[in-house]
């Protein structure tokens, strides 16, 4: 009998501790936050590096595992009477052929199988401009989309779909959620007439406004796409109002202890900032590419102060089941993608790695810019005239090239991964002084991230002395003429005007190249960059491009 009573007692204790009834909220209110960021179209499984999973490799991640995990946590917490919130911190677009072909359509369809409660836009959501974003916003109608530091008054269709903040009305508490995207997003993508401002200032203003709208709100979460370093600044500047920051953009690994994956953590999960006001601000991020699902339960007191917390990111390895609804919904998309991408468009006899393109001349960049030149005329024109083209100079920023090419056949999917942004290849007149300024700007990054703007080129020969001060590093610069015979060079004349070719993103001032936006004249659109690349591959394969002295670096 004593054994039976003891067993019943333990059972009752188990029920009480695993079924958090509403009275628990009289002392502490638990809230579970599930979060993802920088998904980058990893609908399918990947290898541990986030690349397509090949035979023999360990396959992890994929949307089916992510959404299985989200659904499972929600159900488990409901049984305990713990409320939950599913947050997406942006950059769902771009990164695989699934997005290149399916764009907003596949992204919204599959995300809506278990839509986030709240989402902020990342910079890559703007990769195809306002026209590429609006259908996504219209289809994500079950998700609150928040961006407080964006002024959309000049883009009214966007303004209809995005708020600075939202108030999530749960059973036991109302929770304010404010969104911010990296302030420099116009330099990273095509944002149309949208304007952006400082993240912290926008958060403080939104916090005041949401409390006016609902004075009962004393828990505020920021969902950000600004990077971990900026998140820490936000915690410092807004910590009197903000309790939790759910971040993205920097693909940061936060984990307490040894993580289950191969990544090395940058800091604990969560990162804790003790604000002078007495608030404890928790900062979290869940790596990228569907490798992890963030899982944090926070316990708040009656005043909305963080008392304690528990949880860790969940690794999406093979132990995690895959959601059947997601797998079924992916089947027609996979068939379409396979049909479009398995066509052979060229061949390279050498590997063409992308990694070095951010700091030195690379063969991949030579191939890419040569294809841009070919879109406006080739050297074969010298057979019938005294000039071979109207635009003998081309350049592209390293950040435009998103994948390496490997020795062997080049599939359409390979070209698509290399050149996914569908910018126009444009020619325009540019003063020599501004051409030189663009090259100086490309060789003056302030940090590793800014190396994406390093220019690869065709029709230019430049020598940089990197020991000299920024914006004064060019020691020699020659430009190709359009006069036959092909490939003649002369010294740059800063007072002369040159006809150059670049992606439309650069010509529009993207990545900070404001001189191209402000001084370009007689702009001529030719074709999409991917089409220019494929046409060149078909014409000249097999290829064996190499570094050939277009860029010389002196240290």
UniProtKB/Swiss-Prot annotation:
Binding positions (a divalent metal cation 2): 38, 91, 123, 225, 249
Cofactors named for this entry: Mg(2+); Mn(2+)
Coiled-coil annotated spans: none
Tissues with expression: Salivary gland (at protein level). Saliva (at protein level).
Catalytic activity annotation: a ribonucleoside 5'-triphosphate + 2 H2O = a ribonucleoside 5'-phosphate + 2 phosphate + 2 H(+)
Glycosylation site residues: 105, 198, 295, 465
Annotated site location: Transition state stabilizer: 124, 127
SUPFAM superfamilies hit by this protein: 5'-nucleotidase (syn. UDP-sugar hydrolase), C-terminal domain (SSF55816), Metallo-dependent phosphatases (SSF56300)
Record carries keyword Chaperone: no
Listed InterPro entries: 5'-Nucleotdase_C, 5'-Nucleotdase_C_sf, 5'-Nucleotdase_CS, 5_nucleotidase/apyrase, Calcineurin-like_PHP_ApaH, Metallo-depent_PP-like
One Pfam family matching this protein: 5_nucleotid_C
Regulation acting on activity, per entry: DEPC (2 mM), sodium fluoride (10 mM) and 4,4'-Diisothiocyano-2,2'-stilbenedisulfonic acid (DIDS, 100 uM) nearly completely abrogate activity. Concanavalin A enhances activity.
Keyword annotations: Glycoprotein, Hemostasis impairing toxin, Hydrolase, Metal-binding, Nucleotide-binding, Platelet aggregation inhibiting toxin, Secreted, Signal, Toxin, Zinc
Enzyme kind, highest EC tier: hydrolase
GO function terms (MF aspect): 5'-nucleotidase activity; apyrase activity; integrin binding; magnesium ion binding; manganese ion binding; nucleotide binding; toxin activity
This protein's GO CC annotations: extracellular space; plasma membrane
Thermal dependence, as annotated: Optimum temperature is 40 degrees Celsius. Active from 20 to 47 degrees Celsius.
Compartment list: Secreted
Entry's Gene Ontology BP terms: AMP catabolic process; suppression of platelet aggregation in another organism
Disruption phenotype: RNAi-mediated knockdown results in reduced feeding capacities: smaller blood meals and longer times to complete blood feeding. Decreased ATPase and ADPase activities in saliva. Reduced ability of saliva to inhibit ADP-induced thrombocyte aggregation. Reduced ability of saliva to disaggregate ADP-triggered platelets.
UniProt EC number: 3.6.1.5
Signal sequence residues: 1-25
Family classification: Belongs to the 5'-nucleotidase family.
Function according to Swiss-Prot or TrEMBL: Facilitates hematophagy by inhibiting ADP-dependent platelet aggregation and promoting disaggregation of ADP-stimulated platelets in the host. Cleaves adenosine triphosphate (ATP) and adenosine diphosphate (ADP) to adenosine monophosphate (AMP) and inorganic phosphate. Interacts with fibrinogen receptor integrin alpha-IIb/beta-3 (ITGA2B/ITGB3).
Protein name per the record: 5'-nucleotidase-related protein
Organism in which the protein naturally occurs: Glossina morsitans morsitans
Organism lineage: Eukaryota, Metazoa, Ecdysozoa, Arthropoda, Hexapoda
């Amino acid at each position: 009998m004593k054994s039976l009573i003891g067993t019943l007692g333990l059972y009752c204790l188990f029920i009480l501790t695993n079924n958090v009834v509403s009275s628990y909220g009289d002392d502490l209110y638990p809230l579970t936050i599930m979060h993802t960021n920088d998904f980058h179209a990893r609908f399918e499984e990947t290898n541990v590096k986030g690349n397509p999973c090949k035979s023999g490799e360990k396959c992890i991640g994929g949307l089916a595992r992510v959404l299985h995990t989200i659904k499972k946590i929600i159900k488990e917490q409901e049984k305990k009477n713990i409320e939950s919130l599913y947050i997406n911190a942006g950059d769902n677009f771009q990164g695989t052929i699934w997005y290149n072909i399916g764009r907003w359509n596949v992204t919204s369809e599959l995300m809506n199988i278990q839509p986030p409660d709240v989402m902020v836009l990342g910079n890559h959501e703007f990769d195809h401009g306002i026209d590429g974003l609006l259908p996504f916003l219209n289809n994500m109608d079950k998700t609150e989309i928040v961006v407080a530091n964006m002024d959309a008054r000049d883009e009214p269709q966007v303004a209809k779909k995005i708020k600075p903040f939202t108030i999530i009305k749960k059973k036991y508490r109302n929770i304010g959620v404010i969104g911010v995207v990296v302030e420099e997003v116009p330099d990273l993508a095509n944002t149309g007439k949208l304007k952006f401002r400082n993240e912290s200032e926008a958060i403080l203003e939104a916090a005041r406004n949401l409390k006016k709208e609902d004075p009962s709100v004393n828990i505020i979460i920021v969902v950000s796409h600004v990077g971990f370093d900026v998140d820490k600044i936000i915690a410092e500047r807004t910590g009197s109002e903000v309790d939790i920051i759910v971040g993205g953009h920097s693909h940061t690994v936060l984990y307490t202890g040894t993580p289950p994956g191969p990544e090395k953590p940058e800091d604990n999960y969560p990162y804790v900032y003790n604000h002078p006001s007495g608030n404890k601000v928790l900062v979290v991020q869940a790596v990228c590419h569907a490798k992890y699902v963030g899982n944090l339960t926070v316990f708040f007191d009656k005043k909305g102060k963080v008392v304690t917390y528990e949880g860790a990111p969940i690794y999406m390895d093979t132990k995690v089941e895959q959601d059947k609804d997601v797998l079924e919904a992916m089947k027609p998309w996979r068939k379409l993608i396979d049909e479009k991408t398995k066509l052979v468009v060229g061949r390279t006899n050498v590997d063409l790695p992308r990694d070095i393109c951010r700091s030195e001349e690379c063969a991949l960049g030579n191939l890419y810019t040569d294809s841009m030149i070919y879109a406006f005329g080739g050297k074969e024109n010298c057979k019938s005239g005294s000039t071979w083209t109207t635009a003998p100079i081309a350049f592209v920023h390293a950040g435009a090239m998103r994948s390496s090419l490997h020795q062997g056949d080049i599939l359409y999917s390979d070209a698509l991964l290399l050149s996914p942004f569908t910018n126009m290849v444009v020619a325009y007149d540019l003063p020599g002084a501004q051409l030189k300024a663009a090259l100086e700007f490309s060789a003056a990054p302030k940090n590793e991230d800014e190396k994406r703007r390093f220019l690869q080129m065709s029709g230019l020969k430049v020598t940089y002395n990197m020991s000299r001060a920024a914006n004064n590093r060019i020691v020699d610069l020659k430009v190709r003429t359009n006069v036959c015979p092909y490939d003649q060079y002369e010294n740059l004349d800063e007072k002369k005007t040159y006809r150059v070719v670049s992606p439309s993103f650069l010509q529009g001032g993207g990545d900070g190249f404001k001189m191209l936006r402000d001084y370009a004249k007689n702009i001529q659109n030719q074709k999409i960059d991917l089409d220019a690349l494929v046409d060149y591959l078909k014409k000249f394969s097999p290829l064996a491009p190499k570094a050939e002295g277009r860029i010389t670096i002196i240290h």
